[in-house]
């Protein structure tokens, strides 16, 4: 439900969503991994391949396609199925990037510092060099990082404010982030153990 007081927020979020799709569509992914097996995995998934029941029939990157986690490719292939434009699958990088910015800002909002510093620090947290260099590609390290930031921030906010919304964001970030690559399972697992 859109109330009068959160209409500007909805407009900003919708604009960022549209931006994510448009910028992903017009910027071609020229990364090796992106072209070699991430996009091929998405094509296989779009064409009905179920990695639980069978091996892919891919001719390129078969080892990586069949054996690596497919969290990012699954999300991207859903976008690809919806739009029929493979490059638009990269919009998940932008969406996760914006989510990490807003989650960081939400945590920094709890501190007694100037608003401009909160925005600056949230920007620096979300838009770090790895994220900036990978947001236009199907590389997945930036996506792991963005989900980890969301996971960390949502747990901080949940412990501070006790709102279930933050717990749901934490669980979603944890599940999505840990399904992207094998090392992300370790990263998120260590985080959970340290809680």
Predicted feature descriptions by range:
Residues 1-23:
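Start-transfer (signal-anchor) and selected internal transmembrane alpha helices
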Residues 71-92:
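Juxtamembrane segments of multi-pass membrane glycosylation machinery
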Residues 110, 151-166:
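Membrane-interface transmembrane helices that cradle and orient dolichyl/undecaprenyl
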């Amino acid at each position: 439900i859109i109330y009068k007081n959160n209409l500007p927020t909805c407009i900003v979020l919708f604009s960022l969503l549209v931006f994510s799709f448009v910028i992903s569509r017009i910027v071609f992914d020229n990364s090796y991994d992106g072209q070699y097996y991430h996009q091929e995995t998405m094509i296989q998934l779009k064409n009905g391949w179920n990695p639980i029941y069978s091996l892919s029939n891919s001719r390129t990157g078969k080892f990586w396609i069949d054996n690596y986690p497919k969290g990012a490719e699954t999300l991207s292939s859903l976008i690809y199925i919806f739009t029929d434009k493979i490059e638009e699958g990269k919009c998940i990088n932008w969406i996760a990037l914006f989510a990490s910015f807003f989650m960081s800002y939400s945590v920094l909002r709890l501190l007694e510092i100037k608003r401009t510093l909160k925005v600056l620090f949230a920007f620096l947290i979300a838009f770090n060099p790895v994220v900036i260099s990978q947001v236009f590609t199907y590389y997945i390290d930036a996506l792991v990082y963005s989900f980890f930031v969301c996971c960390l921030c949502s747990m901080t906010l949940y412990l501070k404010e006790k709102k279930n919304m933050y717990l749901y964001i934490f669980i979603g970030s944890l599940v999505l982030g840990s399904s992207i690559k094998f090392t992300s399972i370790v990263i998120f697992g260590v985080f959970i153990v340290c809680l």
